[in-house]
UniProtKB/Swiss-Prot annotation:
It comes from Staphylococcus aureus (strain USA300 / TCH1516). Keywords: Amino-acid biosynthesis, ATP-binding, Cytoplasm, Glycosyltransferase, Histidine biosynthesis, Nucleotide-binding, Transferase. Catalyzes the condensation of ATP and 5-phosphoribose 1-diphosphate to form N'-(5'-phosphoribosyl)-ATP (PR-ATP). Has a crucial role in the pathway because the rate of histidine biosynthesis seems to be controlled primarily by regulation of HisG enzymatic activity. This is ATP phosphoribosyltransferase. It catalyses: 1-(5-phospho-beta-D-ribosyl)-ATP + diphosphate = 5-phospho-alpha-D-ribose 1-diphosphate + ATP. Belongs to the ATP phosphoribosyltransferase family. Short subfamily. It is found in: Cytoplasm.
Length: 204
């Protein structure tokens, strides 16, 4: 039995779409029909559905053998896991966004402090970072900050709130991670699951 931690929300929707494409229907249908369940079983696999930022913690602590999580989470801090594979879904990017007329940044709101700090330092720009845990766009709309650093997929949310993308920071994609001990103890099961996803170790 493999236990897999999957990030809820947008990334899981992307995973389900990908599973449909490769016709891994048993797992896809199980995830689609989950209702409010957070623990699902199918095909000798147990899925735990958790907040994205918690996926590497469950894997690190040995509560999950495998995790599927966005690279944005892994970029924010170091985890004691095997950061194994790029996955062919979940593509988006980090960006600086602000009102169209904004040209200078003194104060930035973000949920991704490390990413924002690294970016502005690389540009030689001294900014005050305000950490928020949700609705980051609102901070830009009400002028609490000069701009935001957030994840952009289509730009629809930015546009709906009168913000525009100013700078592309870095690309994001889904990653497959494993618990270090499980990678050896359950290597055959893990490799079998990876093959079922039609990805290769060459994607590391």
């Amino acid at each position: 039995m493999l236990r897999i931690a999957i990030a809820k929300g947008r990334l899981m929707d992307s995973l389900i779409n990908y599973l449909d494409v490769i016709e891994y229907t048993t797992l896809s249908e199980t995830l689609k029909n989950r209702e409010r369940q957070l623990l699902l079983s199918v095909d000798n696999i147990e899925c735990i559905l958790v907040k994205g930022s918690d996926v590497p913690i469950y894997v690190e602590q040995g509560m999950a053998d495998i995790g599927i999580v966005g690279s944005d989470i892994l970029d924010e801090r170091q985890y004691n896991v095997n950061n194994l594979l790029n996955m062919p879904f979940g593509a988006c990017h980090f960006a600086v966004a602000a009102k169209p007329e904004t040209t200078n940044y003194r104060k930035i709101a973000t949920s991704y402090v490390h990413t924002a700090e690294t970016y502005f330092k690389s540009k030689g720009i001294d900014v005050e970072l305000i950490k928020l845990n949700g609705s980051v766009e609102l901070a830009g709309v009400v002028d609490m900050v000069d701009g935001i650093v957030d994840i952009v997929q289509t730009g629809t949310t930015l546009k709906a709130n009168g913000l525009v993308e100013k700078q592309h920071i870095s690309d994001i994609n889904a990653r497959l991670i494993t618990n270090k001990a499980a990678y050896f103890k359950k290597s055959q099961l893990i490799e079998q699951f990876i093959r079922s996803l039609e990805v290769s170790i060459a994607n590391a």
